[in-house]
Amino acid sequence: MADESKPPSATANAKKPRKRFIGSKSATPSKPGTSSSTIIAHQIPEDILSDALLNDAIKQLPSNYSFEIHKTIHHVRKNAATMVGLQLPEGLQMFACVIADIIERFTNALAVIMGDVTYGACCIDDYTAVALGCDMMVHYGHSCLVPMDQTKIKTLYVFVEIAVDSNHLAQTIRLNFPNNRQRFHESLLDSEETDSQIPTGQIIGKSRHLRIEAASAEESAAHGNGTGSTPSAEPTRLALVSTIQFVAALQQLKEDITAEDVAVANRPAGLLEDSVAHESTGNEVGNSPPLVWSGKYEATIPRSKPLSPGEILGCTAPRLGDVDALVYLGDGRFHLESIMIANPTVPAFRYDPYSKKLTRERYDHGEMRTVRDQAVQTARQSIEALPASRPSLVAHKDAPPLWGVILGTLGRQGSFRQLQAITNQLSSSRTPIPFIPILLSELSPSKLALFNPHISTFVQTSCPRLSIDWGYAFDKPLLSPYETAVAVGKAVGWMDKQDGAEGGIYPMDFYAAGSPWAISRAKAVF
């Protein structure tokens, strides 16, 4: 319904379908051979790109890391910034001084290095940058999780894309993963059931080491040029994911392994089982180099909006369709564990682009679900101990313990609207739950133990992985927003809905578009 206060012309225009592209308008159309002002504003001027001194300074940074220095200099000059805050995760802080020196040398701005810990894109600290007097900040190493129009300061996101050896990556996949789906399950997955039945502590001997076989010479000759599969064989289905630094490499990998009958070199690229190397026994026929699978794979790059295709966070990962395995490109396990939790039945592999090793990764889903369910049940017991009427918040010796609702203050980790949604949920519960808001930048067992015995349960809005990974270390239940909804009966728990032999699915959708937790950050309701 149109606003009656608007003039008729405005009301009429409001009924017209909206254009999909909305940009700056020009009084006259641009002539051929000229660029619009909008395009020029976003292009890096040639004098910056060809600045010999600037290019020499950039050489002080690793060439395989894209810090987008030219773009940064352009934006600092364009915004006439006088003080620029630089926020980098700990893994990139070794380059902070060089970047700051370049900015101060080639612009009129001062650079401030924001040294507080940065765990992810949710930790962008525009509030501190403003308090320091900055009029612009550059956030490195993470995607634009907090939109630029919501920050309190002009913000430039630099993903820091990292170049990888795409040829080695593709050949490693082709050496270790048969492109024939049946052969993939027989040689990789089915043997895991046999290995899992070996008693703990039994000496299995050298003959029991992992050995993934490629196509034999006879098979290669029969099937043509080392493809290792018949034309009618179903291809192995792989889901490819990574952090934002390697999403471009995912696209290249998909192109490389979905091509049919590619020419590949017989270059070994060994597989590590659970991060333990397995050496060759030397009993291979003729000690010939292993053959690779040169056939076509079926590769998908899943997406959980608003993230980029293939990008996953420690708290947000998509549910996968029918795939035989997932391949994670990146170092460490934090992000990988997110998609493993969301897809407990999908075998997971990790390719580390730094060590160039491929490992089979596992996660104890049963233990995680049990530990988190115990926290929820303990929280429910504290609710059952409350009086049916609204309890008083006035402290006295017989007062029931409160729930502490923690608003994370490390960057943008905590959302005040989400805090409102949670407190409204507690107040409107069948048994109203007394609570007290708590502001904390970082949580620790010793810090929360100081609130004993007045608080029976903590709810934290900082990061779901704090509860999943470290909840067992706290004296009192430390619930995420999702677990809180389960505890008060507003959401179906992972233990309530059985989905296969391993139980229900624990969702990893904290920032996924349309999830209750994403909606609460925008509307203060679930």
Name every feature range the model reports, one short phrase each.
Residues 2-133, 139-141, 146, 447:
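Metallocofactor- and cofactor-centric catalytic cores in central/energy metabolism, strongly enriched
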Residues 2-45, 161-162, 175-178, 191, ...:
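Peripheral docking tails and interdomain loops at the edges
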Residues 2-7, 11, 16-21, 90, ...:
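N-terminal glycine-rich phosphate/adenylate-binding segment common to multiple enzyme folds
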Residues 70-82, 173-182, 207, 217-236, ...:
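Glycine-rich phosphate/diphosphate-binding loops that line cofactor/substrate pockets in enzymes
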Residues 87-91, 141-142, 160, 240-247, ...:
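Structural motif
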Residues 101-109, 256-266, 289-297, 345-347, ...:
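Short helix-loop-beta junction
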Residues 134-151, 320-338, 381-389, 393-406, ...:
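Extended, charge-rich low-complexity interaction segments
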Residues 253, 335-435, 442-449:
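Redox- and metal-dependent alpha/beta enzyme cores, enriched for Fe-S-associated oxidoreductases
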